[in-house]
Curated annotation (Swiss-Prot):
Gene: metK
Residues that bind Mg(2+): D18
CDD domains: S-AdoMet_synt (cd18079)
Reactions listed under catalytic activity: L-methionine + ATP + H2O = S-adenosyl-L-methionine + phosphate + diphosphate
Region (Flexible loop): 100-110
Cofactor(s) named in the record: Mg(2+); K(+)
Protein EC: 2.5.1.6
Protein's name in the database: S-adenosylmethionine synthase
Pfam families xref list: S-AdoMet_synt_C, S-AdoMet_synt_M, S-AdoMet_synt_N
Residues holding K(+): E44
């Protein structure tokens, strides 16, 4: 008997401690960008029982009441009761923010391409150098309507549904912290065939019984989100498998910005360069170039030029032009990868300033990305999720 071809991804809710930290960092970023679009921000957050620490490097003309932003973010997530060990009213907020290093700033504010010309700017998009070295990946597949791998897409939707049911009051015993995990079985041709296993752990009131949690999660969450044709009698369900999840959120575990980078991206289906997103402005290519790489990959697949596309970009700190661009279509390309790479160079400007201009990234749009994934979102409008380069790519390739 042959083994099944299985792939698993997970997601976490907005009340998960790491996601609380991400949302605080991005809320602070947005508050600063609303006043100063050209601010340089690298904001980290640690949350644990009764305490939030905010630290990092920021260069801005804006004034932001950091503690107020922190409390409002926690309130919006749903930590409003001191019985949970963490609530927006009583939490202690400690802020330690300093100015960005001048050594880094000189390379970001004036890229090597400008410095090599003794400050004489030829192309204004050469002005901004990458905020750091590193490699970033973008991915897209026609496996789902949102051009995302199925396992991570379903995982995000499950925890988002839990949050919606909690906030609407339909399931009154739900609390903010939750996790999901979905295992998808693929056929021998690499096509998603069925959902093999679903794991959901959700924080709950002490009065809730395991039976009602199990029934509600199966009927109001899983069956509401996962298409019936993907579920069968062999699908396995693990609902709160420890048997109890009353202590959760920052009371149960500490949380840190940037610790859910696989949840934020493709659920492990594609490589990750290692850099986190939240709390970083668009001069940080960890964030902006990852968004650009997704934008490129999604437009390639949406144009029908490949069934799957993976883009790798890399940068040197203080240099505008990428040090490398790589495209991989896993044998699904309708044109060669070399032809695609040439088309990418013509259609997309992948210098930091080019990305910022192309995707309009100086706006306070980041808080909405800090939970439920940065890619494949259908509930919010994100510039890197647009497929507005499809026709231009086709034209360049003569399609």
């Amino acid at each position: 008997m042959s083994e099944k071809h299985l792939f698993t991804s997970e997601s976490v809710s907005e009340g998960h401690p790491d996601k609380v930290a991400d949302q605080i960092s991005d809320a602070i970023l947005d508050a600063i960008l609303a006043q100063d679009p050209h601010a340089h921000v690298a904001c980290e957050t640690v949350v644990y029982t009764g305490t939030v620490n905010v630290f990092g490097e920021i260069s801005t003309s804006a004034y932001v009441d950091i503690a107020h932003v922190v409390r409002e973010t926690i309130k919006k997530i749903g930590y409003t009761d001191s019985e949970n060990g963490f609530d927006y009213k009583s939490v202690g907020v400690h802020v330690s923010l300093v100015e960005q290093s001048s050594d880094i700033a000189q390379g970001v504010n004036e890229a090597e391409e400008v410095r090599d010309k003794n400050g004489q700017l030829v192309d204004p998009l050469d002005l901004i150098g990458a905020g750091d070295q590193g490699m970033m990946f973008g991915f897209a597949t026609n496996e789902t309507a949102e051009y995302m791998p199925l396992a991570i897409s379903l995982s995000h939707k499950l925890v988002k549904k839990l949050a919606d049911l909690r906030k609407s009051g339909e399931i009154s015993y739900l609390r903010p912290d939750a996790k999901s995990q979905v295992t998808v079985e693929y056929d021998n041709n690499g096509k998603a065939k069925r959902v093999d296993t679903v794991v959901i752990s959700t924080q709950h009131a002490a009065t809730a019984t395991n039976e009602e949690i199990h029934d509600d999660v199966i009927n109001k969450v899983i069956k509401a989100i996962i298409p019936a044709e993907l579920l069968d009698d062999e699908t396995k369900y693990f609902i709160n498998p420890t048997g109890r999840f009353v202590i959760g959120g920052p009371q149960g575990d500490s949380g840190l910005t940037g610790r859910k980078i696989i949840v934020d991206t493709y659920g492990g289906y594609a490589p990750h360069g290692g850099g986190a997103f939240s709390g970083k402005d668009a001069t940080k290519v960890d964030r902006s170039a990852s968004y650009a790489a997704r934008y490129v990959a999604k437009n390639i697949v949406a144009a029908g030029l490949a069934d799957k596309a993976q883009i790798q970009l890399s940068y040197a700190i203080g240099v505008a032009t990428p040090t490398s661009i790589n495209v991989e279509t896993f044998g699904t390309g309708k044109v060669s990868d070399d032809e695609l790479l040439a088309a990418i160079r013509k259609v997309f400007d992948l210098r930091p300033a080019g990305i910022i201009q192309m995707l309009d990234l100086l706006r306070p749009i980041y808080g909405q990305t800090a939970a439920y994934g940065h890619f494949g979102r259908t509930d919010i409008e994100l510039p890197w999720e647009q497929t507005d380069k499809v026709e231009e790519l086709k034209a360049v390739l003569g399609k």
